[in-house]
């Protein structure tokens, strides 16, 4: 059996982590220099709390995404799983909360514990469903989780309407909750941060110090070789996908607490891509077998710092550009990780007519992004610089290498 590509165990993770730390520092310094409102200075505590909240919420289920990617799979349903688990959690709160009087703190605590348990059980059931579709029905992970990405939200919406009719007598696609424990979770950011730290430590320990962790890396590195070596790959996949859905069920609790409403239509929509992006930026290879927990955590921090920095620099409708930012960061991260392989193999990035067309497309696309964010003069300058740089790369590729 080939040796599992586990950079954490091999001790080759430092460079990637160091690069991310430097990148995070550069983004923060650039934001400090460019932001005219000086938000990091004038509203320091508020900025730290908001970034911490967003990092904790994304980081919790990004760990699940990373474990699945390391095992050689993919989970596209994390956002829908969060929404579904949030609905299950809110439905239990609504069903158990007395309508005729305000429950005591002890009653509210018991209701909250039951609701959290319901969210976790729902997540584990979804993870088990994914494993069955992948191992028994033999669906590719992409297809299996894409199906639940779409189907779970519709199911959660229908369940919302059913619960509202049964409990309140009126239908609705949202479930509003009023529980003091969830209010406490919302108002105390440290709760989500502590949960994230605990999950980071547990995930790191499992991946780096246990047999299951070695099997996850082996499965992602070469599934056929792992199976021939005696590893029960179906069980390892079940552990990976259940852990992914478990992290989503934990994240759902904080999503629900932050908004006090379970909304399966919009809650965590598209956030599964943010989790995958954070894992990839943190060093996880989409082909499997490579990835670290520290890298994933730093990928989450980097992604959220970049998004927050853009929101500070672009004063209006900054959320419009979040998807663009995430996509650009992922492409840049994957390109940088593949750069060494491209150089060593002698392959050309911009070969022939297709390369010239790609240079033109990249220049126009970059100019368009700069136009809508920075203005027409900056867009013109950026377009010219990118055109010159990419054309220089193409010309250098055409030069014969000297031995």
What label would you give each PLM region?
Residues 30-34, 44-101, 132-139, 225, ...:
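Single transmembrane alpha-helix segments in multi-pass membrane proteins
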Residues 111-119, 125-126, 130, 186-261, ...:
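Helix-loop-helix "hairpin" substructures at the membrane interface of multi-pass membrane proteins
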Residues 141-209, 238, 259-268, 313-322, ...:
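Transmembrane helix-bundle core of multi-pass membrane transporters
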């Amino acid at each position: 059996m080939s040796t599992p590509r586990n950079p954490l165990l091999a001790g080759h993770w430092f460079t990637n982590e160091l690069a991310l730390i430097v990148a995070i520092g550069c983004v923060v310094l650039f934001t400090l220099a460019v932001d005219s409102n000086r938000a990091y200075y004038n509203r320091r505590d508020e900025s730290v709390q908001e970034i911490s909240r967003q990092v904790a919420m994304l980081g919790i289920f990004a760990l699940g995404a990373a474990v699945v990617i390391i095992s050689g799979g993919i989970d596209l349903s994390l956002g829908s799983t969060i929404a579904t688990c949030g609905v299950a959690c809110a439905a239990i709160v609504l069903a158990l909360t007395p309508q005729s009087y305000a429950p005591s703190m002890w009653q509210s605590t018991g209701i909250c514990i039951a609701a959290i348990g319901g969210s976790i059980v729902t997540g584990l059931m979804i993870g088990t469903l994914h494993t069955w579709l992948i191992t028994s029905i033999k669906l590719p992970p992409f297809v299996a989780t894409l199906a639940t990405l779409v189907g779970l939200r519709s199911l959660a919406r229908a369940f919302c309407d059913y619960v509202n009719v049964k409990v309140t007598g009126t239908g609705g696609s949202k479930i509003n909750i009023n529980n003091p424990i969830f209010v406490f979770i919302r108002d105390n950011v440290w709760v989500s941060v502590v949960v994230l730290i605990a999950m980071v430590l547990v995930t790191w320990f499992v991946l780096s110090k246990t047999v299951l962790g070695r099997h996850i890396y082996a499965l992602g590195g070469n599934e056929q070789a792992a199976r021939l070596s005696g590893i029960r790959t179906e069980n390892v996949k079940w552990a990976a996908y259940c852990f992914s859905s478990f992290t989503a069920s934990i994240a759902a609790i904080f999503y629900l607490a932050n908004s006090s409403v379970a909304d399966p239509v919009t809650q965590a929509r598209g956030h599964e891509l943010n989790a995958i992006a954070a894992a990839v930026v943190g060093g996880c290879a989409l082909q499997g077998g490579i990835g670290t927990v520290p890298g994933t955590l730093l990928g989450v921090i980097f992604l959220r710092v970049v998004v927050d920095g853009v929101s500070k620099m672009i004063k209006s409708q900054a959320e419009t550009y979040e998807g663009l930012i995430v996509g650009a960061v992922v492409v840049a991260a994957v390109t940088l990780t593949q750069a060494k392989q491209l150089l060593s193999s002698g392959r050309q990035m911009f070969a022939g007519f297709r390369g010239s067309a790609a240079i033109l497309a990249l220049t126009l696309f970059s100019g368009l992004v700069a136009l809508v964010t920075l203005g027409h003069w900056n867009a013109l300058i950026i377009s010219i610089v990118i055109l010159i740089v990419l054309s220089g790369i193409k010309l250098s590729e055409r030069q014969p290498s000297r031995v």
